[in-house]
Amino acid sequence: MTSISKKKQPETVDDLDFGRMVGELIDHRKIIIALTSFATLIALLYAFFATPIYKADALIQVEQKQANAILSNLSQMLPDSQPQSAPEIALIQSRMILGKTVDDLNLQAVVSPKYFPIFGRGWARLSGEHQGNIQLSRLYVSSSIGDEENPPEFTLKVKDSNRYVIEFGGEEINGKVGELIEKDGITLKIDEINAKPGAEFTIKYVSKLKAIADLQENLSVADQGKDTGILILSYLGDDPLKIKNIVDSISENYLAQNISRQAAQDEKSLEFLNKQLPMVRSDLDSAEDKLNDFRKRNDSVDLSLEAKSVLDQIVNVDNQLNELTFRESEISQLYTKEHPTYKALMEKRKTLQDERGKLNKRVATMPETQQEILRLSRDVESGRAVYMQLLNRQQELNIAKSSAIGNVRIIDSAVTQHKPVKPKKIIVVLAGLFIGLVISVSLVLVRILLRKGIETPEQLEELGINVYASIPVSESNPKNVIAKRLNKRDDSRPKVLLATENPADLAIEAIRGLRTSLHFAMLEARNNLLMISGASPNAGKTFVSSNLSSVISQTGKKVIFIDADLRKGYTHKLFNIKNTNGLSDYLSGRVALDKIINNLQTEGFDYISRGSVPPNPAELLMHNRLAELLEWANKSYDIVILDTPPILAVADAAIIGNYVGTTLLVARFEENTPKEIDISVKRFQNSGVNIKGCILNGVVKKATNKYGYGYNYYDYSYSDKK
């Protein structure tokens, strides 16, 4: 009759409840603490050794654009005259502005002190050992030396405050402060040395485009508030004085560009007027001559009151049309015909032209003499008005040109903040702590998900297997203690029998509990033969069987322990007995039965060793001598315990199992999987052997059991010491 009853399928590894997860994290706390501490330490080192980054900023105001003399009234036609910041921001970040800054500050020359790699610069800053600096006013490297991807780089060594040496391409070039060096494609001038003799500096010459790109990367321009017309320029860098000079240079170059552009607009308008004035004056003189000639021929005919009124209106319309013509010539240089400003001007011109057409129709109804004198008078008046208007505009433009200030002004010059903006030490350390915690917890969770070993008796019971005992890891062996703390198992074989060496050990206490359970479990067995096997090597079946034999013998029962592992049995070492004559020797017929029985020190405890390793263990076990031996032992002893090889490795246990009345399977905690135990049970059943139950060996006390399942086995010890 089998003791195995099929129950529900075991939980999968993915079925992790919150309590078990908390327990696992507590069990792996040392790994979590170690990784988190390591990540925090790295963050601390970075926070203190990383180069501080400072920020310099300046404020610039972009005012509403001043209309020049010709466009003085144009703002009335615009729906919104607020400054547009996006074009100004793009202009500040353009190569035109930044390129001028690169030239002004010689930013193509990158000079940096030489430090020990990685930590050298930070250590020098923390210890106050600064390398000093050098002032370089001119540097040029021929394009034949290096390229944009690999800019030329050379080393400058300070000899004293007035002399230095350049090392480049295996050659040395000696130089003095204030002297220009021109040699081998290198042009260099050092103005000042503020460094100790022996100090080294790296000098790199980058292309202008690369220098501009570096400026664009570290420069930010943004509005300070919506529709304020205030721009804030910010620049990041590790040299407080240098970044201040860079921001000041960018601001000044932007201001100068704005002023020059305004002056250029006035210059173009003035050039246009200078061309128009002579032609307008000539037309005016011609119109006056024609009017005088007409009056002489017609005896000084004067205009009627109606004609004078029409003339005044026509002259007024013509003046407005002429002014629009000037405006159009200026606007055409700034906007396309599709721009709203240009369209508004054209609509106003059409309105004036329509009005002039109506006035011309009124003139057509007058007498011919009045029409002619009206036409000539209109030409004179319109020409005179245009000429005077142009003269006024010319004077205004001359004044505007000489006093152009643009629509930009610098409100606050550049200032570098005293405290660095990067790295934020507290944030860096907290980030390191968080990242270390996330990584360590993730590794633990991945390890848990990948682990498929048995952790609780419930997993075996879900397979329908009775669990007779859960044996904890012995703490008597220091290796076991270390392995327990590291959540590992100890693969080394025991050298002594724990039941005699330390009978108070928790593992032996668990085996005593197993002894009690077996007393009742074997009452219905067909004989008193007990076979103990394992699913796989290192399950601990030898440890369990040998110590179980010892604790049963201590009750006064007559016990014989047989090492039936003919391949790797080692129990003779536990009992300190020579392995000359053993089970294999008896089964092969080389020795008699009485020669293989060893009487141990404990009364009533006999032992049969493995014997010599045979070439055919399975065949020997199928010999009739094994049946005869077991029948004799069954009659001669109260209990016979056999230690057999693991069933998944060899078939020896299946052969022996047909002779015994009780079979127990040993499973290793977190080592054997439920699937391995299930396969082992089926393999025994296929051979006609029924498994009475299972022993869970090597159990480690874990927080997982406390928080996840609520079981803690052998958490207490019992002693008579006070």
UniProtKB/Swiss-Prot annotation:
Pathway: Glycan metabolism; exopolysaccharide biosynthesis. One of its GO terms (molecular function) is ATP binding. Autophosphorylated on tyrosine residue(s). It comes from the Bacteria. It is an enzyme of class 2 (transferase). The chain crosses the membrane at residues 31-53, 427-449. It catalyses: L-tyrosyl-[protein] + ATP = O-phospho-L-tyrosyl-[protein] + ADP + H(+). One of its GO terms (biological process) is polysaccharide biosynthetic process. Coiled coil: none annotated. PANTHER family: TYROSINE-PROTEIN KINASE, TYROSINE-PROTEIN KINASE ETK-RELATED. This is Putative tyrosine-protein kinase in cps region. It comes from Klebsiella pneumoniae. The lineage of its organism: Bacteria, Pseudomonadati, Pseudomonadota, Gammaproteobacteria, Enterobacterales.
